[in-house]
Amino acid sequence: QVVQRDHHAEYITTLGVIAGTLAQIALEVRHLQRTEVREAEEYFSPKQKGSSAMPHKRNPVKSERICGMARLVQGYALPAFENIPLWHERDISHSSVERVMIPDATTALDYILAQTTDLVDKLLVYPEKMLEDLNMTGGLIYSPRVLLALVSKGAYRDTAYRWVQRNAMKRWLEGEDFYENLCKDEDVRKYLSEEEIKECFDYKPMLILPLIHI
């Protein structure tokens, strides 16, 4: 009597997954816009207000709206699943739900797509601040590259891990120079020259792999 509602459930859940992906983009912007990070932020027009009480604020209102609307779309997944079982394939308990669910979820996702497109198109990015934040680690972000360099030269991975970790912890806990400590470490120097260690302390090769995937 009626079309099986699993098709409708698949459609609604697909919308929910898309909404979740867009919300992930928006959530990343929200984190990057935090005062202590500020590596990227939403476009902020000259006459825009970030807060009615605090004139200095530049709240990521568009990103927050995207995240909120995504929850709404994803919330329709439950009634979509509950619509699948029908009495003898002929009752219309699904109808009242679908009259709200399908148009609302569809138009909401359309709105989220438009908002996310505008967010990305106008996104303000601050590479200098990104580099500044990277440098705050004192080179600790390069520990994986040092580890891989040691392994490529024949060191056992677990052993090399301990060598790199002990020098990294000196930086983390005592503020010592990570690079200099590696250069002074007799175990590390058995496998890597000072120049080879220095080559590990370069962020540019770390950007290549993401670009390949994009």
Language model features by range: what are they?
Residues 1-107, 114-148, 194-204:
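Conserved catalytic-core motifs characterized by acidic clusters
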Residues 59, 154-158, 190-193:
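Helix N-cap / loop-to-helix initiation motif
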Residues 74, 169-172, 190:
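A short hydrophobic/aromatic micro-motif that marks alpha-helical segments and, especially, helix-coil
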Residues 86, 169, 187-188, 206:
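Residue-level marker of structural boundaries
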Residues 123-185:
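C-terminal alpha-helical interaction appendages
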Residues 212-214:
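Conserved small/polar residues in nucleotide/adenosyl-binding loops
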